[in-house]
Amino acid sequence: MSKHTVLFELGCEELPPKSLKTLRDALQAETVKGLNEAGLDFASVEAYAAPRRLALKIVDVDAAQADTQKRFDGPAVQAAYDAEGKPTKALEGFMRGQGITVDQLSTFQAGKVEKVCYLKDVKGQSLDALLPQILQTALDNLPIAKRMRSAASRTEFVRPVKWVVLLKDDQVIEATIQDHKAGNVTYGHRFHAPEAVTLAHANDYLAALEKAYVVANFEKRQATIQEQVKKLADEVNATAIVPADLLDEVTSLVEWPVALRATFEERYLAVPQEALITTMQDNQKYFCLINAEGKLQPYFITVSNIESKDSTQIIEGNEKVVRPRLSDAEFFFLQDQKQPLASRKEKLANMVFQAQLGTLWDKSTRIAKLAVALSSITGANPADAEKAALLAKCDLTSELVGEFPELQGIAGTYYARIEGENTEVSEALGEQYLPKFAGDVLPKTKTGTTIALADRLDTLVGIFGIGQAPTGSKDPFALRRSAIGILRLIIENELDVTIEELVNLALQGYGDIVKDHDKTRADAVAFLEGRYRAKYEDQGVAVDVLQAVQALAPKSPLDFDKRVNAVNHFRTLPEAAALAAANKRVANILAKEAAPEGSVIEANLVEDAEKALFAELQAVTPVVEPLLAAKDYTAALSKLAALRAPIDAFFDGVMVMADDADLKANRLRLLAQLRNLFTAVADVSVLQG
């Protein structure tokens, strides 16, 4: 069967930049799905996207579906013919329905019954006939929240459609898609090459558009932007901040990217750089530049969609646009400094945290008391922790945070520095919200760690205390994410504390506000322990490793983490699979018949294999016990791995359930001793493979 290259392009008005990549990928996926469902084989489907177009190139696609046979089932052979071999009424009805004669019948075996059938030859449809509907269906299935149409069109799309290209090699496939007749004419850059571009062949698409100042390949356009931005940054010994989302959005805004470096007045560098970066990235789509120390430089890079003969005008235009925004940030920053942070508590007293849990000032005072209590665990200075907690939410009343909500905490740090607070206090104000997401950095200061813990614990315990724990997809206070943050703060700072101890400390701040302390404690502890799985799955830890540790229900997150790491390492040992299987066998035996109380009686060991296992246990136990006491679980399991050979020999040569009651009891005690050594770390019997 012959193969062809197909080009499809949908031209339209400017597509939403934040959706362009998603639309491209969805169009590709839906088209692949349609081709597969139609039984059309192909080598690849390449997808392209630019501000005014979505396109696909289908490589080496079949010219048509393969011819097939469709089977229509009739009556059983026994019921199809009478004693004389003539068709019965049942068979005649079947033939009449299919419009066939006896000589066109076949038979097939349906289980034990032979049946009559008609095998109808079905000629495969051509690519030309199938493709228009495949593409239209793909367009209809795109994830578009709100569709629109132009006045002359009956069909809807995310933006009004202007033209459609559908080429099979060098031939136009006759089709009407999105109310537009397909052709071989596309259009170049709106300003540099607005005239029509006739495509002679599907393979000419990318090159023809590049001549018309359009880079249709999204990744190529993006790489060009990255190269240009890096070059401009290097010229001033700086590094560009290039967030992935911003890069995607800028790539979606231009057909012919031209990066230009502009400047702003150095006086604005006195403003918190986070505010300047936010306004330049979010509002202007600029790439900001920083030096080797991470300090903002008085430059920014804009990406133009025009290759201008005089780029100075474009640069000056952008500098003129950004100046008022930077001035606004400067104004807010200076205005806020007229009111010290500590004096803002009155405004916090009028800001509701949660109707039943009080105002933000109520929360601040609870956090302060909790932070003092936590200081003995985190090693923070109690006075610093208390002061930082009382100042922590004050910047929420500032004009800078009002304009840039993402600066909460960060603004507080700047104001605290200006007011002369020490580093522990000032840095803690910004660190209180860390970690913000999975993989985010943690606070660097002990005070920051303390406030971050106190804030999260206060919210979690309070919300559970009023019966508003997360349910299903509802988690308005982001407690699931917050819980993982609590676990990380404990584990990565190596805080030796149990979850219940922390919850109890947080409960003390609520007094009578929380009516049922026992239920709240139990629910909050269970919730935090239930977040281990999400935390470790993000790190790639297997579920059975978690199950092995959870079987012991460790109370301390730090202890839990050490056990997880130990079991993870244990799984890499060559003895692991055999020892896991042996432990499972031991667990099953002891589940059916528990070991009698008492120690193993050496005189009752009669088989060489059980004597050898006992000797190994006696030798390894005094080595392992100090490791367990020191919580060096990785080393403990590594030592226990040496028991593989004597355990295997034991099960190969010893009958545990002996007829002699004393021998059986002794062997059960031996297995219990073995089991207890392993379960001092984790239940490795649940490990798979």
From Swiss-Prot:
Enzyme class: ligase
Catalytic activity field: tRNA(Gly) + glycine + ATP = glycyl-tRNA(Gly) + AMP + diphosphate
EC number: 6.1.1.14
Domain of life of the organism encoding this protein: Bacteria
Cystine pairs: none
Keyword Membrane belongs to the record: no
UniProt-recorded Gene Ontology molecular function terms: arginine-tRNA ligase activity; ATP binding; glycine-tRNA ligase activity
UniProt GO BP: arginyl-tRNA aminoacylation; glycyl-tRNA aminoacylation
Listed InterPro entries: DALR_anticod-bd, Gly-tRNA-synth_bsu, Gly-tRNA-synth_heterodimer
Subcellular locations according to the entry: Cytoplasm
GO CC terms, sorted: cytosol
Keywords recorded for this protein, A-Z: Aminoacyl-tRNA synthetase, ATP-binding, Cytoplasm, Ligase, Nucleotide-binding, Protein biosynthesis
NCBIfam families for this protein: glyS
Family membership: Belongs to the class-II aminoacyl-tRNA synthetase family.
Subunit record text: Tetramer of two alpha and two beta subunits.
PANTHER family registered for this protein in UniProt: GLYCINE--TRNA LIGASE, CHLOROPLASTIC_MITOCHONDRIAL 2, GLYCYL-TRNA SYNTHETASE
Protein's UniProt name: Glycine--tRNA ligase beta subunit
